[in-house]
């Protein structure tokens, strides 16, 4: 599978806001499972041990249906990158791929659709079931193009955008798309008002 990811933003400023938001525990569980599957149980133990105590208490044993703070998720992901010796951006994309594979084959398999545009439209409508900040809207641009806009997100991070890119790439591939390209044409991390993901596949 070929993936292409380009950030097409007008500023090199990369900022983040971590406090106040929550994500579903299924995301945390998928990221820990990624470490276990790729690097083994010892790497999971080292990752959890590298976290601040309050983050460890939140992510260790989290349920798929429960909520985890956005800040704890980002701290977990950065601990994974350090422990596994990976560059953060590349690892976040890979975590996004893995999360899509795991969640769409298990707890969220009922959300899969024959039509990828239908999946993204439904996903935008269900946004608040997976994170409690921001709103998402989906626009079908052509049979093989789409656009996702994320508005009013009080929490954001370059790491999360990279993970979202990987997730979108894998979702499109799971639904049969080839030669997937994701372009982030605007981003709150670069002082833009919204995050915009341009999707293209064959």
Where are the language model's segments positioned?
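Short terminal or interdomain "cap/linker" segment that borders an active site or interface and mediates
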Residues: 2, 8-32, 128-165, 172-202
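N-terminal low-complexity or simple alpha-helical regulatory segments
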Residues: 2-104
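Long, highly charged amphipathic alpha-helices
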Residues: 30, 46, 75, 122, ...
